[in-house]
């Protein structure tokens, strides 16, 4: 198409077009642009949000929540007279122990308290405490002037015993445990059924089993099942390693066992898991030197707490060991450990399931034959199969690949199962189980 204007005139028109000044938007235009894309009730919602922010600001100013840079409230909000009165009314209390209650059934009972390393006093109750709150042998808080009882105190528990309580639930569930289907069912019958359906045992007139012994070769899933139980139940879970109860001084281990069960009785329902119980539960014998006397005292205290004169209450006890033949017969008898669950080596189906569990969190090929891998790992424990999966990932990392192939798993089987066979202690433990 011919250009009738000419190249020079067209260039001049384009320059005039570019030289037009850019007009800035005024406030009205900006407000109009902000309304684009808003819903019908946007203005009302914005107004309500502004009102809420203003109210929160006023509340914070009145309550003094917003503090200054020094970490203190503004001086205008200080109330020194009230603070002084509070300090005078709430004096620090002294810890004592109520040893005896005189005339407990009368309207004006008296309490004999023993202040440690000081003296004994016969005192009254303050107005804040009811007579039913105080029992003989209980620790109480008394004031320093009249020695009146102000508050009942919880029993004294060693901090090392308190730290054995598991606060956070483990992330292991029953679906993460492979090759232990029968063992998990037996464990749930003892632990979960009495807590969730106690009426079944009441109707039959029997007491549920209160103690379980988990035994088997290393790496078969004993501790893993206990972690799954802790995740499943809402009861308090306390984990104790047997060697923690072996103390330096005489009587310390027995005292820790006593305080452990005392703390467990304060809970609504409690599970105590003793791992490696053969550290303190070995059969008693006299070696002539008396080196194991303290360990035997600890075990005797444990035996007494499991089934002694005092009732155990709603406390379930789980114990795990690799050597059940070394445990004391008094610890193994029914009433203390009612059920013995053996964790044997997983079969072909169990090994295949364990491979799938560990491969679930890995980047692997889709067509890996896990049953073939399980057949190549006879008499292997779950821990060894987990090591195979880890080594397969290491082979993939060495080859700079993002996924693990079946070849990596086969090489890992040759390395872990075949090469490390001389380090395996499973056959040795199988002779004892």
UniProtKB/Swiss-Prot annotation:
Alphabetical list of SUPFAM superfamilies matching this protein: P-loop containing nucleoside triphosphate hydrolases
GO CC, any one term: proteasome accessory complex
CDD domains per UniProt: RecA-like_PAN_like (cd19502)
Residues bearing the modification N6-acetyllysine: 116, 422
Keyword Membrane attached: no
Primary localization: cytoplasm
Compartments, record wording: Cytoplasm
GO biological process, one term: ubiquitin-dependent protein catabolic process
Keywords for this protein: Acetylation, ATP-binding, Cytoplasm, Nucleotide-binding, Phosphoprotein, Proteasome, Ubl conjugation
Claim: Acetylation is one of the keywords in the record: yes
Comp. bias intervals (Basic and acidic residues): 8-21
Record-level Gene Ontology MF annotations: ATP binding; ATP hydrolysis activity; proteasome-activating activity
Region described as Disordered: 1-21
Protein task: Component of the 26S proteasome, a multiprotein complex involved in the ATP-dependent degradation of ubiquitinated proteins. This complex plays a key role in the maintenance of protein homeostasis by removing misfolded or damaged proteins, which could impair cellular functions, and by removing proteins whose functions are no longer required. Therefore, the proteasome participates in numerous cellular processes, including cell cycle progression, apoptosis, or DNA damage repair.
Family as reported in the entry's similarity comment: Belongs to the AAA ATPase family.
Subunit description: Component of the 19S proteasome regulatory particle complex. The 26S proteasome consists of a 20S core particle (CP) and two 19S regulatory subunits (RP). The regulatory particle is made of a lid composed of 9 subunits, a base containing 6 ATPases including PSMC2 and few additional components. Interacts with NDC80 and SQSTM1. Interacts with PAAF1. Interacts with TRIM5.
Name of the featured protein: 26S proteasome regulatory subunit 7
Source species of the chain: Mus musculus
């Amino acid at each position: 198409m011919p250009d009738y204007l000419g190249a020079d005139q067209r260039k001049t028109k384009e320059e005039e077009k570019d030289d037009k000044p850019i007009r800035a938007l005024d406030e009205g235009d900006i407000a109009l642009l902000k309304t684009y894309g808003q819903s019908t009730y946007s203005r009302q919602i914005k107004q309500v949000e502004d009102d809420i922010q203003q109210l929160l600001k006023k509340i914070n100013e009145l309550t003094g929540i917003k503090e200054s840079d020094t970490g203190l409230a503004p001086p205008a909000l200080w109330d020194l007279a009230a603070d002084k009165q509070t300090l005078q009314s709430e004096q620090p209390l002294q810890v004592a122990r109520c040893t005896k209650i005189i005339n407990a059934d009368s309207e004006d009972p008296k309490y004999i308290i023993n202040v440690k390393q000081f003296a004994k006093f016969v005192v009254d109750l303050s107005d804040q405490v009811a007579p039913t709150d105080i029992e003989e042998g209980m620790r109480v808080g008394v004031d320093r002037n009249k020695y009146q009882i102000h508050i009942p105190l919880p029993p004294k528990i060693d901090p090392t015993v308190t730290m054995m309580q598991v606060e956070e639930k483990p992330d292991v569930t029953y679906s993460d445990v492979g090759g232990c289907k029968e063992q998990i069912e037996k464990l749930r019958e003892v632990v979960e059924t009495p807590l969730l359906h106690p009426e079944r045992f009441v109707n039959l007139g029997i007491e549920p089993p209160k103690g379980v012994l988990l035994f088997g070769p290393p790496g078969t899933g004993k501790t893993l099942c206990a972690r799954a139980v802790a995740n499943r139940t809402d009861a308090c879970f306390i984990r104790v390693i047997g060697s923690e109860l072996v103390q330096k001084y005489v009587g310390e281990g027995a005292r820790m066992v006593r305080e452990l069960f005392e703390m467990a009785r304060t809970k609504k329902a409690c599970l105590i898991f003793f791992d490696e119980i053969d550290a303190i539960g070995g059969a008693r014998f006299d070696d002539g030197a008396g080196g194991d006397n303290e360990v035997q005292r600890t075990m005797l205290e444990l035996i007494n707490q499991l089934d002694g004169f005092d009732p155990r209450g709603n406390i379930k006890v789980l114990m795990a060991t690799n050597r059940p033949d070394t445990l004391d017969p008094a610890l193994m008898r029914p009433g203390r450990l009612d059920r013995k669950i053996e964790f044997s080596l997983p079969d072909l189906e169990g090994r295949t399931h364990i491979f799938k569990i560990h491969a679930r969190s890995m980047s692997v090929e889709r067509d890996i034959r896990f049953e073939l891998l399980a057949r190549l790992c006879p008499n292997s424990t779950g821990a060894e199969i987990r090591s195979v999966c880890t080594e397969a990932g290491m082979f993939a990392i060495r080859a700079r690949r993002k996924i693990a192939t079946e070849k990596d798993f086969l090489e890992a089987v040759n390395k872990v199962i075949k090469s490390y066979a001389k380090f395996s202690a499973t056959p040795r433990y199988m002779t004892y189980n």
